[in-house]
Amino acid sequence: MLGFLSASLVKTPYKPPVKREPISLDRFILLKGMPAGLSLLLLSIPYGMTTNYVAMYAREIGIHTQTGFFFTFMAIGMAISRIFSGKLVDRGKITQVIATGLNLVIISFFLLASCVYLIQWNDAACTILFFGIALLMGIGFGIMFPAFNTLFVNLAPNNQRGTATSTYLTSWDVGIGIGMLTGG
C-alpha cells in the first residue's frame, strides 16, 4: 500500500505518443541480402549434417578411433582460419575469402566420401585423413561464415545492421536445421 501511495505522488511531464512504423518483413530480413542468405543457407546444410552425423558415419565405415577428436580438429581449423581470413576481409576480399572457404569445404567433403574406399586398404591412413579432413573443413567453414557476416553487414545501411545480422543468423540456423533433419 505504501508503495502504491509513493508511486502516485511521482509527477512526470506529458510526452505525446510516438508514431511507430507498421511491422513489415524488412524489419526482420534484409531483402537486399536474400541472395547471400540463400547461399549461406545452402552452405549451412552440410555443416548441420556433418556436425550431427559424422561420428555415426565414421563408425559405419569402420573408423574405430575416438571420433570426438574430429570436432577438436575442426575447432583447431576454425581457430587457424581466424589468423588470416579477418585481414583479407578487412582488405575488401570478401567474395574471394568465401570462394576459398567453399572450395576447401568441397574438397573436404569429397575426401570424407573417399574414406569409405580408403579404409579397405589402410586403416591408419584413413584415420589420419579423417582428422585431416576435420582440420580442412574447420578452416573452410571458419573462413566462410565470418566473411558472410561481414558481407551482410556491408550490404545494409547503418540503420539496418541489426536486420543484416538477423538475416545472417536466420539463414545459418535454418540451414543447420535442414541439415540435421535431412541428414539423418
Question: Where are these predicted regions, by residue range?
Answer:
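Loop-to-transmembrane helix entry/capping segments in MFS-fold secondary transporters
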Residues: 64-65, 158-168
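Small-residue (Gly/Pro/Ala) motifs that create kinks and tight helix-helix packing interfaces
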Residues: 55, 178-184
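Residue-level signature of mid-helix packing/kink "hotspots" within the transmembrane helices
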Residues: 75-83, 176-177
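C-terminal membrane-cytosol helix-exit motif in multi-pass small-molecule transporters
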Residues: 1-17
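Helix-to-loop junctions at the C-terminal end of transmembrane segments
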Residues: 81-94
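C-terminal transmembrane helical hairpin of 12-TM major facilitator-type secondary transporters
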Residues: 93-148
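Transmembrane alpha-helical segments of major facilitator superfamily
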Residues: 69-78, 172
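Extracytoplasmic gate region of multi-pass secondary transporters
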Residues: 33-71
